[in-house]
Amino acid sequence: MRSERLRWLVAAEGPFASVYFDDSHDTLDAVERREATWRDVRKHLESRDAKQELIDSLEEAVRDSRPAVGQRGRALIATGEQVLVNEHLIGPPPATVIRLSDYPYVVPLIDLEMRRPTYVFAAVDHTGADVKLYQGATISSTKIDGVGYPVHKPVTAGWNGYGDFQHTTEEAIRMNCRAVADHLTRLVDAADPEVVFVSGEVRSRTDLLSTLPQRVAVRVSQLHAGPRKSALDEEEIWDLTSAEFTRRRYAEITNVAQQFEAEIGRGSGLAAQGLAEVCAALRDGDVDTLIVGELGEATVVTGKARTTVARDADMLSELGEPVDRVARADEALPFAAIAVGAALVRDDNRIAPLDGVGALLRYAATNRLGSHRS
């Protein structure tokens, strides 16, 4: 998960309430179940002496949120000042999670976030395209109607002008493909989408792909979704594109796992594992990707700054800082990673780093732990 969108959490002052719950809307009693869930959440927060304004802001977010479609979860992160995260999850969490802490708890977001990178969906035919740009919660739509005409070849074989008509048709198709290709190229250059989905009949997709410049064509994922005029709704577009995003997510985790194992194996200094090494790398701003495994109830200590994390008090004292707080590792380490702009990846049991946490590093530091002691 890219952490840029969560960067503003670092500037917020706690305590934070982090709540993840089943927000599915697939039964007749969905509204009643949501109300019951919220009552349980409220009771738990009250038992932890959460401030009333924090509870009120969460309650308002729950009651005013748009209902989910089908089986979904919901993530809420709030302080007494504002709701910082309020979004659906791709599925319900295994159980309701409620945290009240100096840190926001973001680990379930890594697993279940619905938010996608910027992408484009284009439904094309030989007359033009319907193009949508997705950036976070914003959707920008453009209809491209090419000026080339006609785009259908005659079926009458004996017509004297068939050759000229065929040439005119092919030229019209090329003009319209060029208009769509030019628009997609401008979108890619301006918005930098991670993927450009192209749907439509095979010939329309093939002709467009051959017209696109290479820097755009490499981002294209073709979808077999029928003709442009089928006019897919947002839920259908979501379902059609989900497989590609799932594939990319799996490929990302696979790549991280392979790179981590390779760097650990060769002792390059470009990977770290275990609480001591990862905390040191986070303090140095050296973490490119944080790998979060099963941290359980593990804790770390921090100095005055919430991002000054160490495995224990002795390591912190070597930095000349007293212990200001003891924090859960699964809260403090992702928070520190967000602060340095690192990506967050969940270990799916393929990596199993020491102490349940690992990292890919931006640069190799010789004897990092020893240098902090000297």
UniProtKB/Swiss-Prot annotation:
UniProt xrefs under InterPro entries: Bact_RF_family2, Ribosomal_eL30-like_sf
Record's keyword annotation contains Heme: no
GO cellular component: cytosol; peptidoglycan-based cell wall; plasma membrane
Gene induction: Induced by anaerobisis (at protein level). A member of the dormancy regulon. Induced in response to reduced oxygen tension (hypoxia), low levels of nitric oxide (NO) and carbon monoxide (CO). It is hoped that this regulon will give insight into the latent, or dormant phase of infection.
SUPFAM superfamilies membership: L30e-like
Pfam families associated with the record: baeRF_family2
One annotated GO biological process: response to hypoxia
Protein keywords: Coiled coil
Segments forming a coiled coil: 39-66
Name of this protein: Uncharacterized protein Rv2629
Annotated source species: Mycobacterium tuberculosis (strain ATCC 25618 / H37Rv)
